[in-house]
Amino acid sequence: MNLKKIFIVMMVGICLFQLPVANAKNNSAKNIQTKITTEKIEKSMINSIRFSKASDKVRVVFDINADTKYDVKQQPNGDIMVDFSEPINKQYLSGINVNDDTVPFLEVYSDDKTSCVVIKVADNSAFDMGELNNPRRLYIDVQKDYEYSITKELEPGLTQISYYSKKSGVKQHAQLVEVSPKYFKFVPVLGGGDKMAKNTVSAMSDYVNAAVAENASYFGSGKELYGVTKIAGDLVSSMYLTRTGFGVLADGTPYIGDVNYSGIVQSKNGDVYVSGLNGTRTSDSVMLYNQYYGKSTGTDNSGIEYVVKDNKIVKVNSGNSLLRPGEIVVSATGNGKNILSGLNVGDDLVVNQILNTPWDSATDILGVGPRLVKNGQVDITSSIEQIGSDVTGARAPRTAVGILKNGNVLFAVLDGRQAHSKGMMLDEFARFLIGMEVVDAVNFDGGGSSELVIGGKIVNSPSDGMERPVATALTAVRR
């Protein structure tokens, strides 16, 4: 073999020897690269979660990678759910205690590939979110102050509004119902059905199969009502103080305005002014009674009582006269008794009960007060109407009825004296109602009496922790 052939054979051998070595080096490089890539994937995770608290918000910050994907959604209960495309450092899996009234805790869930953080929100608070750079971070700001309403149409002409707010740490919650007069009529209901008594709002709602019911009148320790009440054209109670009332006019129009009552009894002996209707007779008064008061007047025999039908005396008693439909009892003591004494069965006794216009022709009235809103402006008439400090003096649960710009009627009940709702002063309540587009509104009895019933179910949280028996309810009944 010549030298040239020997050289060629040697070179081929060297190449053949080097090829496995090169392949080995290439394979080794691939293994190293694979290992590095794998380690990078394993280390690609959310390594840091932190938070800060300020007077107006709680900020939660996530350190995320360049290729991290995420999805943020608020759940119906207010919690904020953040889904990540990579796992979270295991040190956070036990959760994070934020210890704030708005955001008490962060729940953390993670597997080898994805993760989820649930920001527990005590209230259905609004939030903002965004990113910060260098390094990349996701932040979520949960607002401590909020105000929102949830609206739900229950049926044609009936819409429920649930209101929630938190301002400067003060929470408020109200339940409201917008009712169309086209589909519903507005009916005052007595606690005893056809008699004056106390009962729960839900019971009064059941009396008339109401779609909506809320508490209405002020009342005494007995069964007396404070304010003018008129049901289906019949007067049930009175008050000599002018008070604001809600009612239904002769043409069916809902109306809010000042209600003024006066009464006079005319006889051949002279005229006497009426002290009131279906109230407590005192030692010097002329009180009228009708069938709505109960079975009888319940008076002692210190006075004189005339049972009157069609302006004629049909019976004379000294007290505790029976009360029948179509009859009215004139019960007098003191000076009124002196004037009316000596009248007999068959004598004329004309009883006049007078209401100011347009209430004189109204079918239904609930006189309560004070007025809250007039022509879209705050108008608190508590001083004029001589409303006591127990109503005006502090934040409390509130009940009102208002007439909206569109002519619909708004039933409104605000919770109070509870952690979830502080309650409002009257002027706060008035401004709140104006925010709901109320044009005119009157305040009803509040405090532990405040209650709203929809479809037979209580939808607010009475401050007594249970239903309080009350004197009257305003209801909306399907036409």
Language-model regions: role of each:
Residues 2-23:
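Sec-dependent N-terminal signal peptides of Gram-positive bacterial secreted proteins and lipoproteins
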Residues 1-2, 135:
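Accessible peptide chain termini
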Residues 19, 25-65, 69, 77-82, ...:
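Gly/Ser/Thr/Pro-rich low-complexity, intrinsically disordered segments
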